Each structure stands twice: as structure tokens, then as C-alpha cells.
């Protein structure tokens, strides 16, 4: 990072704010991190070159990106080891360079050692105080605790867990301006190969399919009425970055004797749950939870959630039990200048996706020179991502993506 120029063009057109970040090391190297190495990040990293290249790289980034309206602020370091007194002089220098190149935007640093950074005065060097995982220190009061101590600060969650309490604390504290959740989109890396191929705790999987967590976040942020069903499929992972372990399908054969936790993620006033035609009643949506919860027995058929605002039906989500695999369906196609994204799913006779299908699919009538690759979004499947040399791809959750060159590019 920083990202490619095309990323900023896209954010400009879509209306996204960008926290333009540079450096995860200054002149001290990291001593930890996720990698194949037992001692963390590899030793030959940017701290060896910061004194020579830091100013040059910062100026080049700002000059390249400062005319993009999407750029909201600059982040001069993420979890750098210099969050102590020895980092203050460097912070002042980097901030002065940033002001010289762009006096219009605020600067921050993403601090995971913010207790020490407060004590040493490191966080006072920036326009905005950036906190990574504030609930590690303030699990109950979060941003309210920091505001009480530093009432004149602007606070920002520069990196946060998925936990709803982070959003609620920002929502209810005017001094906290927002959060950057780790992470929105699954990605390759930060793993121990070959157990899995990348980080899988995002709101969307690496193939771009939304997970139930996506709709919980949409409930936080959207004015549009939202309701989405998620069924607990097992215990939550003992991992702080993991969202709730739910799935949005209604194929639980073999668990007919179990009581299932059914979440209806929503920003409506209340939600009504139905199994088949039988109503299980309406429940209020918790203001600080953004869901209503039922414990219900599994019965094959249909489960539906209806959201109400001021007594009026405004949103609905249904899940149907799928039967036997019958066909492969093209669910969506996205066409871009240099790539076509085709979403495929395995469906039954009624067109319902088969959520446990791992079928292998060979695209028919497509010249091999147009095929770019396949992805099923499953980070634990070593065959989940295949490139152009592969003739077929494997589904996960009954779906996959095929990437093609347009006719003119073949």
C-alpha cells in the first residue's frame, strides 16, 4: 500500500471515503505478525529503508492522490513500533511534510499501543487520535472513556473488530467520527500455508459473495430498511476478529431434533418470523444489537422474516429448503472493460441454491483463451482458486465465480 490509482478513481465515482495510509514501519522493525515465519514479519522490511526513502515515498503518495476527492485523511503509520517517545520527532517531521504537500486534510496514526502512546505524548502529535482495537483496553466504555480523558480530541477507530459494541460506541459519542472494520473483504495472506490461503473474517468472501455479517453492517449504516436471516451453524470461533458463526440457508436436515438460533439482522422497529405459514410473532429489534432472535425447531420448507417500521411492512427476507441438485444457473453477470465476472450456482428444480454443493463445473462453449480463472470464495479449499490453465472450477456453498476476457480482448 498505497493502492493503485484505479482504486481512488473508483472510490471517487462511488462516493467512498479513503483513509490514505502509508507505512507499517518507520525506522524500527516489527517483532511480530502473521506469516510463515515463527518470529513474525520477515526481517528485510521497510524499516531498513525508511530513513533514506520515507520522505520521498510520502511526498510521492500525497502528490499522486491529493486531487482525489475520496481522500479524507492521511494515516502516517499503522501499528508502527515507534509509538513511544522516540517516535515523536519522526511524527512531527512526517506531519510537517504532509502539511507542506497538502494543508487541507487531517493526519493520524493507527495506534495499537495507545496506552503508551498517550503517556508519552505520541498521540498528541496528530489532528485525529487513531485507535486500533480500543475495546482491548476499554471493553465496556470504549470511546466514552477516551473522550472523558481527552475531551478535545477527535477520535477514530482506525481498526476495529466486527463486534457491534464498537459501532454503538461511535454512534453514541459525537467525538468519535467512525471506524474501519478489520476486515470488509476476505484477502490472501496473513496465514500459515497450507492450512488455508487467506484471511476469511470479512463481510464478503474473496469471491465477492456477501456473508450474513454484511447485512448486519448494512443494518448499522443504511437508511434503507434491512432484514436478513442468519442461522447459527455452530459455536463462534474463539478468535476476536470472527463475526457470529451463522449461515443464510435453510437446509438443516439431520438436525430436526435440534433447536436452532435464528437471527434476523435488521434496522427496522420490529421483525416477524414465520416458518411456513405459521407466525412465531413479532419481536423488537434491539437498538444496540440490530437483530431479533428466535430459538426454533427445524422444519423443511420456508422461513421468512418481515421487517416493520411504524407498523408498516417495509422489508422481507426468505430462505427455502433446497432439494436435489438439478442444474447450474447463471445468477449474475458483471461486465467491465477488461474482464467479465460470471456468478454460477448449483440449484434444484425450483431454482434454489444447494448450500452444501461442491460440484465441479466446466464452462461450456467458452474458448480456453477467454478463460481467466475460477474462485469459490472458500479460503480453506486448496482448489478454491484456479487460474486460466484449469479447465474446471469447484463450487463451495453451491456457487462459484468464473472470470472471462471479453470477446475483443481474447
Question: At which residue positions do the language-model features occur?
Answer:
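Short solvent-exposed capping/turn motifs at the termini of beta-strands
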Residues: 347-348, 355
Amino acid at each position: 500500500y498505497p493502492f493503485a490509482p484505479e482504486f481512488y478513481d473508483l472510490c471517487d465515482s462511488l462516493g467512498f471515503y479513503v483513509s490514505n495510509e502509508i507505512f507499517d514501519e518507520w525506522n524500527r522493525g516489527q517483532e511480530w505478525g502473521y506469516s510463515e515465519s515463527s518470529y513474525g514479519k520477515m526481517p528485510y522490511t521497510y524499516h531498513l529503508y525508511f530513513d533514506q526513502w520515507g520522505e520521498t515515498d510520502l511526498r510521492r503518495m500525497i502528490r499522486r492522490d491529493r486531487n482525489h476527492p475520496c481522500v479524507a485523511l492521511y494515516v502516517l503509520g499503522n501499528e508502527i513500533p515507534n509509538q513511544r517517545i522516540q517516535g515523536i520527532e519522526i511524527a512531527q517531521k512526517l506531519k510537517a511534510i504532509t502539511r507542506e504537500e497538502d494543508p487541507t486534510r487531517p493526519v493520524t496514526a493507527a495506534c495499537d499501543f495507545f496506552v503508551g502512546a498517550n503517556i508519552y505524548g505520541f498521540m498528541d502529535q496528530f489532528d485525529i487520535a487513531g485507535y486500533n482495537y480500543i475495546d482491548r483496553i476499554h471493553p465496556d466504555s470504549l470511546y466514552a472513556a477516551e473522550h472523558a480523558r481527552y475531551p478535545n480530541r477527535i477520535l477514530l477507530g482506525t481498526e476495529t473488530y466486527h463486534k457491534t459494541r464498537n459501532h454503538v460506541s461511535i454512534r453514541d459519542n459525537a467525538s468519535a467520527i467512525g471506524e474501519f472494520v478489520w476486515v470488509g473483504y476476505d484477502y490472501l495472506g496473513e496465514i500459515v500455508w497450507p492450512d488455508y490461503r487467506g484471511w476469511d473474517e470479512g463481510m464478503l468472501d474473496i469471491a465477492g459473495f456477501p456473508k450474513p455479517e454484511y447485512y448486519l453492517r448494512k443494518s448499522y449504516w443504511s437508511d434503507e430498511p434491512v432484514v436478513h436471516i442468519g442461522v447459527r451453524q455452530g459455536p463462534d470461533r474463539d478468535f476476536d476478529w470472527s463475526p457470529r458463526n451463522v449461515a443464510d440457508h435453510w437446509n438443516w436436515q439431520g438436525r430436526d431434533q435440534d433447536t436452532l438460533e435464528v437471527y434476523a439482522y435488521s434496522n427496522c422497529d420490529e421483525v416477524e418470523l414465520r416458518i411456513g405459514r405459521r407466525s412465531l410473532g413479532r419481536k423488537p429489534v434491539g437498538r444496540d444489537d440490530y437483530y431479533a432472535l428466535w430459538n426454533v425447531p427445524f422444519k423443511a420448507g420456508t422461513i421468512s422474516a418481515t421487517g416493520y417500521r411504524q407498523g408498516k411492512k417495509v422489508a422481507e427476507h426468505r430462505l427455502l429448503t433446497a432439494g436435489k441438485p438439478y442444474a447450474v444457473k447463471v445468477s449474475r453477470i458483471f461486465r467491465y472493460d477488461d474482464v467479465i465476472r460470471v456468478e454460477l450456482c448449483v440449484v434444484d428444480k425450483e431454482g434454489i441454491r444447494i448450500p452444501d454443493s461442491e460440484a465441479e463445473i466446466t464452462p461450456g462453449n467458452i474458448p480456453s483463451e477467454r478463460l481467466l480463472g475460477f474462485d469459490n470464495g472458500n479460503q480453506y479449499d486448496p482448489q478454491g482458486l484456479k487460474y486460466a490453465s484449469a479447465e474446471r472450477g469447484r463450487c463451495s456453498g453451491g456457487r462459484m465465480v468464473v472470470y472471462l476476457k471479453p470477446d475483443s480482448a481474447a
